[in-house]
């Protein structure tokens, strides 16, 4: 039995239908594959992103702001999306386990992630959140509140916020205890609520952590065997969308680093996933990181997807 940390993207959850029902339907679809994976005897911790959701929630907060109903800060919005998406996943997985007669409890944990208050991202926001805009729409939004908008992997323009590098999962001991009790745990949602340590206390900061880097830290903190990062394609590609594109199957740390140097991976898209995978497997021959689609999860034991390991 392997311990697997599975990272599910927020963009995958909010695909085309931003309604409550639409996002639940996507989560229900993902839960079927995760349940089948668990049915094979695998231990699983589920993390999820929240980029579109937290951005939309922040817009709702700003739109409804008044003296008696002030907008909540970004770290609180991250916590709120942990609750909503965690509920959807918890409900969907519980239902799928019931269908399969799997006697495994499911729980969502509100998770704080310690970051460095001196992290350079606080001065240079880089994490895209919220909806996509045209260039004209983004310029108009930026003029309203001075926020920064950047192009996101050719899909349009999005607001960017600080995204400090995760250092530690504050609730890691609780997560370990739940795993040892054979509880499927949903945690570190949206990359975790970013907090800094000040005078022996944890204090929330306005930022959104990258869920793949947080999943990597979580996988290290609980000594997971595999980090599985789910995305919209079955494999990583080099020369993506070119006539000579090539799917990568099993690659070493050295090979992945060379592909990064050659500029094959977009900074706001596949690059952070690969960097998180590399950080997890470096220096440990037993660990594997796998990047693939949710539909390919059932084939992972057959070396499906892109498998990154120390030696390839």
Swiss-Prot record:
InterPro entries: AceGlu_kinase-like_sf, Asp/Glu/Uridylate_kinase, Carb_kinase. GO terms for cellular component: cytosol. The keyword Nucleotide-binding applies. The keyword S-adenosyl-L-methionine does not apply. Pfam families: AA_kinase. It is found in: Cytoplasm. It catalyses: hydrogencarbonate + NH4(+) + ATP = carbamoyl phosphate + ADP + H2O + H(+). It is an enzyme of class 2 (transferase). Its EC number is 2.7.2.2. One of its GO terms (molecular function) is carbamate kinase activity. Keywords: Arginine metabolism, ATP-binding, Cytoplasm, Kinase, Nucleotide-binding, Transferase. Pathway: Metabolic intermediate metabolism; carbamoyl phosphate degradation; CO(2) and NH(3) from carbamoyl phosphate: step 1/1. GO terms for biological process: arginine deiminase pathway. CDD domains: AAK_CK (cd04235). Belongs to the carbamate kinase family. This is Carbamate kinase 2. It comes from Enterococcus faecalis (strain ATCC 700802 / V583).
